[in-house]
Amino acid sequence: RDGWICLEGPGGKEQQVHMNDDWYRLVQLALPQNGTYRIRYKGVGLIQMYLSGGPDLMERGIRFLDPDSGDEMELGKWYDTSVREQYHFNPFMNWVNDPNGLCWFKGYYHLFYQSNPFGQEWNDMYWGHAVSRDLLHWTHMPYVLEPQPGLWRDKEHKGGAFSGSAQVEGEQMHLYLTRHHGPQEDGEETREWQTEAVCRDGIHVEKERPCITERPEGASFDFRDPKVQRAEGRDYMVLGSSLDGVPSILLYVREGGRWLFKGPLLQEHEPGIRTF
């Protein structure tokens, strides 16, 4: 089927996005300020809709809109229910799991998290984002990482932006994460690799690139969740995996811009465990 979304702006200017056979997809449309807009759609369902950008976004946060009416949603009423966690962070709606990239950068604590914006179950993974000045009051930010584009229309495979960490270096935040692609049931066709991305303004992520694409000899297809730490002037990374059938934390060190495998840092010999 041919579903579409059309944004009509000042002067009747239109932006159209055709969805075709895409199953789930995050669509971004540019809105110049100080205009009136109308959104039309057919053959698709809008699950979440928000406004982002503009000045002071770190303080204001994004503005969630009702997909049917276009009205701004009042978060106080949305969160003030007996089934909502009131102390710890939770997203606006739908699935959340692993927290990632926890760091302090340019005056804010940053929390990234694995998310499925489209439903209340695990699916292809996005990275959501929130910021805080005190670790109690959180401001919602735009999603920063999406699944690989081919997964939008592929029901036979799963993947996306899996867990990772952050390292702040001066005016840049470096995000390290695992990209996953494989069949619905994990196995030897499953592929996981590590990437690095840069964030300069605390909002937008750019220049994501692979940094470790091949597993060391003997490592299983479970090869994920990079944690990067600097010690004595050198950058180290640990990854969860299994080495020759033994659950292992793999140690890497950065040398000359490349990550080199040094061996297992810790192993678990208790039977019945698949991976760290």
Positions of PLM-derived features:
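Beta-rich carbohydrate-recognition and catalytic domains
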Residues: R1-D225, Q229-F276
